[in-house]
Amino acid sequence: MSEIRLSTECVRYIALFESMTDASIKDCIIDDGRVIYVVNTGDMGAAIGKRGDNINRVKRSVDKHIELIEYSDEPVTFIKNAFGTVSIKSVKISNKDGNKVAYVDVSSSEKGLAIGRNGSNIEKVKMVVSRHHDIDDVILE
């Protein structure tokens, strides 16, 4: 795994989130009006809170859309977590021309959800998977 560098803005967002939720954050990415938090394994419940109270409180404080991804040391599990509610049939990771590529099998009815508006979901997945598991590309099948 490559070293993750955080901007001072990200460090502030992490400190705010951790102080408001008691969840531990592994990474933070600020991207186009949204903040993506990678939550340590097992802390997702604390991050969300009862009835979503914690995440809603953080959202009001930062005035941006908040997305949470639960971290996993296992790349396949992490990729599934990064896709959120999308049903993933399978994930295969292989080397192609010297690059690590994850092939994600998604049902055709959920492919649009996996891609997201203007490709925002697939780009998010590619970004976090690259940062945490050195996977160069994610391809939907």
Question: PLM ranges: what are they?
Answer:
Residues 1-141:
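RNA-contacting regions in translation and RNA-metabolism proteins
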